[in-house]
Swiss-Prot record:
Pfam families: Linker_histone. The modification N6-acetyllysine is found at residue 17. The lineage of its organism: Eukaryota, Metazoa, Chordata, Craniata, Vertebrata. This is Histone H1.2. One of its GO terms (molecular function) is structural constituent of chromatin. The gene is H1-2.
Amino acid sequence: MSEAAPAAPAAAPPAEKAPAKKKAAKKPAGVRRKASGPPVSELITKAVAASKERSGVSLAALKKALAAAGYDVEKNNSRIKLGLKSLVSKGILVQTKGTGASGSFKLNKKAASGEAKPQAKKAGAAKAKKPAGAAKKPKKATGAATPKKAAKKTPKKAKKPAAAAVTKKVAKSPKKAKVTKPKKVKSASKAVKPKAAKPKVAKAKKVAAKKK
């Protein structure tokens, strides 16, 4: 009995490792699902657009085209039928023969042209936006030109005070010359007058003495 007891716990660890292997096996399955190609609707529209039959493409011919593109038709048979019905309801495909998924299908030219027109409008809008951005550039050039005008005006203001200072100096210099000349003349006249007055007084005194 003592020998059989340790054997039971030794068998337990392999049972715990088994779930880890199952989890590792599940991960690749998830990766395969993500790596699936484009949706069925896109493949159907491409196959119908590639066909040159005027009456439309039958379901059998459609399946052959999808199988040639590498799509598993047998597993995704129900998806193909649902994709056809949804494309017909959206107006992308037109059913020329039969009802439901069984019949012939043709690409709707109006729907294809309607999809092309919005793309053309977007391209036209993008072109219209570009000239608006180009028109903004000249505004920057005018802004850069304004400092030049301001720089030209400043020297003119500096020249006017200099010219005014020159005229003031010219006007002041003649006034000084006029003031100095009369002063010299007055001093000369004052010096001459006393000399002339003294002899007259002396003559008068001599005449008075003679009369006595």
